[in-house]
């Protein structure tokens, strides 16, 4: 597959990118989104727990140990799939949204919107698409730095989205 063209971040007036992160029931074909967090270019954030659809039964205790979300919590406090899809479209519609785990997040969004019977009105792209070749090796380091500076817990969707947006901002100065 050909490499995607890099879009430089060096314009000082350029808005911060919208970012998104998804926590899931595990990995693999039967996994599904359980928490979706995002940060808009103006800094507004959102986060929703997703109530699993009745046929979404896959649950990986290893993944649960990382994100700390129990299935019982989702069943009691999660929002219905259609409501989550509608809210994502309301909040993110018209934006290109960036993910540092696009290879996982894209299929999980597809699962969510397919179950909701709707389509996203935003575009999800890999965060690396924003970077020049010389910046690619620095993203992980600056992502860790962003978590430290923000003093937030990892593997919660809105925190991860905030840290990614901050890391991308830090890369502007590199």
Model-assigned labels for residue ranges:
Residues 2-104, 147-151:
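Conserved non-catalytic scaffold segment of RNase H-like nuclease domains
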Residues 113-125:
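A short alpha->loop->secondary-structure connector
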Residues 55-58, 64-67, 71, 125-165:
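Active-site-proximal helix-loop-helix substrate-binding element of RNase H-like nuclease domains
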Residues 90, 94, 115-118, 173:
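Secondary-structure boundary motif
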Residues 1-7, 135-140:
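Short, motif-level signal for alpha-helix interfacial/capping segments enriched in acidic residues
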Residues 32-35, 111-115:
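Short, glycine/charged-enriched secondary-structure capping and boundary segments
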Residues 96-102, 107-112, 142-174:
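Acidic, Mg2+-coordinating catalytic module of metal-dependent nucleases/exonucleases
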């Amino acid at each position: 597959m050909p490499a995607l063209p890099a879009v430089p971040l060096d314009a000082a007036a350029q808005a911060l990118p919208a970012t998104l992160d998804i926590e899931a029931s595990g990995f693999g074909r039967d996994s599904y989104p359980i928490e979706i967090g995002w940060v808009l270019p103006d800094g507004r954030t959102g986060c929703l727990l997703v109530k699993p659809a009745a046929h979404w039964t896959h649950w990986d205790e290893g993944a649960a140990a990382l994100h700390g979300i129990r299935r019982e919590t989702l069943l009691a406090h999660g929002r219905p799939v259609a409501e989550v899809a509608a809210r994502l479209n309301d909040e993110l519609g018209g934006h290109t949204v960036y993910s540092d785990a696009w290879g996982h997040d894209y299929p999980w969004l597809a699962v969510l919107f397919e179950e909701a019977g709707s389509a996203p009105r935003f575009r999800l792209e890999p965060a690396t698409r924003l970077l020049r070749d010389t910046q690619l090796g620095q993203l992980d380091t600056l992502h860790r730095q962003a978590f430290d500076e923000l003093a937030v817990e990892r593997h919660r969707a809105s925190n991860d989205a905030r840290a990614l947006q901050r890391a991308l901002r830090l890369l502007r100065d590199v």
